[in-house]
Amino acid sequence: MIPRSYSQAIALTGLMMLVGLASSARAEVQEFNRRATATAQIMAGISPAGSDLALERRTKLDAFVEHQKWMAVQWSQARGRISAMQDWRSREINIPGTAQKTLLYPFSGPDFLNAYTLFPDHSQYIFFSLERPSSLPDLESVTPVQFGKLLEDVRNAFRDIFQRNYFITDYMSKQLTTPWIRGTVPVMATMMALMNQRIIRIEPVDLFPELTRAYEARDTVKHPRMIMRGVRIVFVSAGGGAQQQLYYFSVDATDKALEFYPGFLEWVGQHRPASALLKSASYLLHDNQFEKTRNMILAAADYVVQDDTGIPYRFLHQAPWQVRLYGRYNKPIKSLRYGYQADLKGAYKEKSDLAELPFPFGYHWRGKQSGLMIASR
């Protein structure tokens, strides 16, 4: 059974979000959830400061000492890339009124790292992809041996994003379904800890509870292959300031699958003004199976940062959009050759003054081969 009015539900949800953000902005120093923050810090290889003695004891174990060393080395290398991204962002990304903007990040996986590095001042972030959100692990309940396996799973989940600056979907299906690390929430929370954020709360979100109940019944109605699950993470910088929030939804975003959730893209698209981030997206928006998602982004966003795997260049190389190109264009990797864009290749050839992109972005991550575009209107 479909709810009588999606628009009413969507309007109410949006109002509640705005009220919450407005009230949080008044406080300079925010209280935070110490257990959730400490859990994220331990997974990030950071010894948490505080009075949570149960978790503090975990940091004395050899497994944590080993994990801390590994994370320190990997994060030190990643910090060089992030610093280059931050410097580039300060010069090239100029968005007025960012404190009231939403970042849309389709096919995101748990990639808070790139989203927050490029768009740190947005008030909220909306991610969606196939991977389940799940929840933080309970570090107090696991044995020392299990704790060691959990930290090993964290390292496995971070190898690709640290090395390549993107996640590999096929690998994530295994990395985020272990007995100890399940879903995107543990990875996003760990990234928040690495970026010096404090978690205020993590809570499930169900945009369409009537649909969820109907689809979970299964014997009463035709149901989707995967039922949408959502989560909201409210967080704040360790240095204080206004709260920010991240919505993450696991959903099949093909046009056919979205027929089961006809209000989802309407809900996402109502959050304006919006920016959009698209990277390492397997050229999904080049496929007519994702036409609804592509059209939603083109309608809702007035600022898009993407590599060549995002919205096809032909949709942006026209009024009212203005496009700036960075780095270089390379043919898609072997398994994704169908994403080749002759018009984008030509646009790069016409530019004689293109600066190298000083960080890896997308599938061509080796040897300064990456390209990126900013489209604005």
Give the predicted meaning of each segment.
Residues 21-27:
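Sec/Tat signal peptide C-region and signal peptidase I cleavage site
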Residues 28-159, 237, 243-377:
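Non-globular targeting/processing and membrane-anchoring segments
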Residues 108-120, 126-127, 164-189:
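Short, thiol/selenol-centered motifs that function as redox-active sites or metal-ligating centers
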Residues 125-175, 200-220:
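Thiol-based oxidoreductase modules, predominantly thioredoxin-like and allied folds used
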Residues 1-13:
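Bacterial N-terminal signal peptides that target proteins for export
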Residues 13-15, 25:
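Cleavable N-terminal signal peptides
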Residues 155-162, 186, 190-196:
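Long, charged/polar, surface-exposed segments that mediate recognition or autoinhibition
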Residues 192-266:
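Active-site/pore-lining binding-face segments in mid-to-C-terminal subdomains
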